[in-house]
């Protein structure tokens, strides 16, 4: 997982007088799930459109699998997940994928294989209009990976999904990655990124403010806390042996005590506070 499949240097993009990205540098290693994190308007979707050739940058350099993002040489090697607007509601699950098999000029024998990967094989004859939201989302994934891409671009893959459907999507992403697919995803869900991503980059106001392994970032920017509950109050204190000892000496009845693990959300809040 040491070869970079995405290399970005000094990437910049503006829309009239609005700066969307400015001087962004990052790389994505082969075989990893890389998360681009930030609030709405941070520049995440703009970044993914630049990486996939849907937009042209104002400055900087992008290399995708050693090529420019709009190169025809890499078209068959990447998958881009979009919303369900491309699904044909009055056609069957199988026929929806048959259309994409024809677009990529691949044998239709791959359809049942990819349906099995996303657990939709038993629904292949159903109309898309009859599918649940979760099943539609899995069909979108099937459409995205039908040509067996080595690199996936996913823009907010679980946004606006209920918890059960979002979990289904995360499991598919992890399963694809376990088979060797590199994944670049954008999300504002810090917990989701912590669960799935090997590395993350925090984006704020068009700038990358920090990047690294989630555990390393939490260790660097967050402090563990202790939650204590007594008969009178429920509160937290920093994980400090001396402070903890002092607290315990003054407590008559301790009902509960446990450590609170740091989160990526805390890291982001710390970083943005330092930036301001």
Where is each model-derived feature located?
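Short, charged/small-residue-rich alpha-helical element at the C-terminal edge
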Residues: 214-276
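Conserved ABC ATPase "signature" region
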Residues: 98, 102, 108-124
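Catalytic Walker B motif of ABC-type/P-loop ATPase nucleotide-binding domains
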Residues: 152-156
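Hydrophobic anchor residue at the start of the ABC signature
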Residues: 141
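Conserved ABC transporter NBD signature motif
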Residues: 60-76
